[in-house]
Amino acid sequence: MIEADRVQLLSGEPEVVLTPSNSGQGQKISRCPVCKVAVWSNYAGAGDTVRFVRVGTLDEPGQVPPDIHIFTSTKQPWVVLPRSIPAVPEYYKASDYWPKESLERRTALRSAKPAR
């Protein structure tokens, strides 16, 4: 996930698809208008200020390894996760895992986020 203003589109505008989610608040999935691959999602809790970018859509995905694996309770048994990266069965409390700088960035986003 990253601040929306740090995401640079190389061409075109994504096609936004409103999709139900387990929270009941839904999510907006932004897709490439040509191939329809999901590029990022926006979840209701974070609004439009944070994008959950699909790392496989980046020019250099190897530069952005995961910080944590989530929802591992539903992973396939043949998927082997490295022990060097935290893994949790569902979601997690950010303050338990995120570095101080990331927590500060989240705080800044929340304080700048317009009221709904």
Located regions from the model:
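A short Gly-Trp-Pro
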Residues: M1-R116
